[in-house]
Design a protein with these regions (language model features):
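Short runs within selected transmembrane alpha-helices of multi-pass transporters and secretion channels
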Residues: 116, 184-203, 211-219, 240-255, ...
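Hydrophobic/aromatic residues within transmembrane alpha-helices of membrane transport systems
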Residues: 70, 82-86, 98, 123, ...
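Short alpha-helical transmembrane segments in multi-pass integral membrane proteins
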Residues: 4-7, 20-65, 123-190, 232-288, ...
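Small-residue hotspots at the loop-to-helix junctions and early N-terminal turns
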Residues: 92, 96-103, 182, 241, ...
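Helix-terminus/linker motif at the lipid-water interface of multi-pass membrane proteins
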Residues: 73, 77-96, 165-172, 228-235, ...
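Small-residue-rich hydrophobic transmembrane alpha-helices
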Residues: 95-155, 192-211, 318-382, 415-437
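Hydrophobic transmembrane alpha-helices of multi-pass small-molecule transporters
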Residues: 107-110, 222-226, 252-256, 328-331, ...
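Transmembrane helical elements of multi-pass membrane transporters/channels
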Residues: 63-82, 184, 195, 218, ...
Length: 490
């Protein structure tokens, strides 16, 4: 970690602990100025050349993966900032409202993120083959697909908000808070789409640093606005939602303008802006299947959230905090799986099968090391991690969350392998297999969760155990399919 990152962490931690609002705002402002100076000194377009088809395999994947990991960490900070401050400032009901909203937000955003991810696989192949004309045509076609779906999704989520909240068995005392929070967040879905579209585009051509930098600016702004809106202006959960939307808008606008200026080879020309049906069909076959994978995954999580809600506010609050910790914990292997997918896709486009074989071996060893290390840290530190989100006086909530983390945290290697399998099949033009693995994993999780939770002697603990069992079954299916195909780079 360099001196810039250390100073940024110190500024943010100090801001959150400062007793006065003016002091918190001053610290956030200083952190922003520090990062502004960093941006001026860095020529970010030159930090990473983007070619993953040459050089050391392990080093190349790690250099590309690290900014993804840090970027996902910052992405999680959007919601964690809300959760942390809401839980401490507004109380358990507000925490339950924001936490139960998280699953629905992730489900909706996963649809257009899945579209962007699927298009990104095509971008990587074209970039690996050095087909820049085809890449620009694909950018325009994918913008039509992603933009259209996002607008429809935005309208639908606002129209059906109340019925969906009730379908999730949200307790009556929490429902008004959840509705207010979700309404504002869904109004701000378009900036989230714009940011992710350009972030996946730049990652496809091997630049994972630029999206990270704009996310960092956004997170600093998000935390500052959280403090201002909730502590200073007493806006409640509406303030938390407004802070997140405003920060995401800044990230989206900044990344769009920066990409246009600093990546001229990606800028669309008049000849590129045509309705290319073959390109649309190809992108649709990738993006829609990846979208199905992401939406199935998060729909399963949404069903589980509804089951969790039926156990009351204490379990809801514990689950809300523990899921945040969980998402941070397996983030390294998730983002390494995405980096691995881009690595495979570029080399697949370039015809480098020898490099793909060696990359698979390196990825398995690295994922195993990541997962085992994080599992040990989460298992040992579970009580302390829960106390970051929940007041120490809430002993029942902390105990429930610790039980969740002890069960999930013991099996992170299973989801690490699953992320590698998702990325591999997406990169070699088999996104349908990623959908199959998702159905196996989430189907097992949902069915077992409802079955085990219905047993009085098991209760909500059965929900926690259903997750690693689903990971294991999907891993077995994915490896079996790989071993059954002799042409899969062995």
């Amino acid at each position: 970690m360099n001196i810039f990152q250390i100073n940024m962490q110190k500024c943010l931690l100090f801001a959150l602990s400062f007793p006065k609002l003016w002091g918190q705002t001053l610290c956030i402002w200083c952190a922003s100025l520090t990062f502004g100076g960093f941006l001026r000194r860095k020529r970010m377009a030159d930090v990473y050349k983007g070619n993953l088809t040459t050089g050391s395999i392990t080093g190349t994947m790690l250099r590309f993966a690290f900014p993804l990991m840090l970027g996902n960490l910052l992405q999680q900070c959007y919601n964690v900032a809300d959760t942390l401050i809401v839980g401490r400032v507004l109380g358990a009901d507000a925490l339950a409202a924001v936490g139960s909203s998280y699953a629905l937000i992730v489900f909706v955003t996963s649809i257009f993120i899945g579209l962007c991810m699927g298009c990104s696989a095509v971008f990587s192949m074209q970039y690996g083959a050095r087909d820049l004309d085809g890449l620009r045509r694909s950018i325009f076609s994918s913008a039509l697909i992603v933009g259209g779906v996002t607008l429809v999704l935005n309208v639908a989520s606002l129209l059906w908000l109340t019925p969906v909240i009730r379908l999730l068995h949200t307790p009556p005392e929490v429902e008004p808070l959840a509705r207010s929070y979700l309404f504002i967040v869904f109004l701000g879905m378009v900036p989230v789409c714009v940011y992710n579209f350009y972030a996946f585009l730049l990652r496809a051509v091997g630049n994972s640093v630029v999206p990270l930098c704009f996310l960092l600016v956004s997170v600093v702004l998000n935390i500052g606005l959280d403090l201002l809106f909730m502590l200073g202006l007493h806006m409640g959960v509406e303030g938390a939602a407004l802070a997140t939307v405003a920060a995401q808008t800044v990230a989206a606008l900044g990344l769009y303008l920066y990409t246009r200026r600093r990546f001229p080879h990606l800028r669309l020309r008049k000849a590129d802006c045509v309705v290319d049906l073959p390109s649309i069909r190809r992108l649709s076959s990738y993006s829609l299947l990846t979208c199905v994978q992401q939406s199935v995954m998060n729909f399963g999580i949404l069903l589980v959230q509804g089951l969790v809600n039926s156990f009351g506010t204490a379990v809801m609050a514990a689950f809300a905090a523990a899921v945040k910790i969980d998402s941070f914990a397996y983030m390294p292997v998730q983002d390494f799986g995405n980096a691995f997918s881009t690595f495979i896709a570029q080399n697949f486009g370039a015809g480098r099968t020898d490099r793909i074989r060696r990359g698979i071996r390196s990825a398995v060893w690295l994922t195993t090391a990541f997962a085992l290390l994080v599992s040990a840290l989460v298992f040992v530190g579970a009580p302390w991690l829960m106390s970051l989100f929940v007041s120490p006086s809430e002993a029942e909530i902390i105990a429930i969350g610790v039980e969740y983390l002890h069960i999930e945290g013991s099996f992170y290697v299973g989801i690490g392998y699953l992320f590698l399998l998702y990325g591999f099949y997406r990169a070699v033009a088999l996104p349908s297999m990623s959908v199959v693995l998702t159905v196996v994993s989430l189907g097992t999780r949902v069915l077992l969760a409802y079955l085990l939770a219905s047993l009085p002697q098991v209760g909500y603990t059965g929900i926690w155990w259903s997750v690693p069992i689903g990971w294991a079954l999907a891993d077995i299916v994915g490896v079996w399919y790989y071993r059954s195909k002799p042409n899969f780079f062995r």
